[in-house]
């Protein structure tokens, strides 16, 4: 009866410790890359095509609501970035309106249970971002949608949200 003969053809692949370590390293780096990418890419915030219009006399602040909380999400704000263009100096201060929403008013207390600096605050569905605008001379200010710096769960980012605004500061 014939017997099987084993022959060495020299084409065998030998795995070394180095190749296993390299594969494990590639896997770890790839996994960390995906985690870091996911942490820096939260879901987009809603933007609005509408433009909020308001007017106020010189030296009297007006409060303009530009962004509302998002259903099902609570953001922990690190800041609010505002870009405004005007024909003269205007002061624009972002504020967090707790428990209410404002379109445009000179008395936000009627609509907000509390008006606070948004930095470090949670931003929920019942809250809104309000811009306080004032000028000591007549002006027209065009304000782009705000950008919120925030953390949500283990994701963080700075994204645009809300509506733009046009505010006219009128002479007395």
What are these regions (language model features)?
Residues 2-172:
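Non-catalytic macromolecular-recognition regions in eukaryotic signaling proteins
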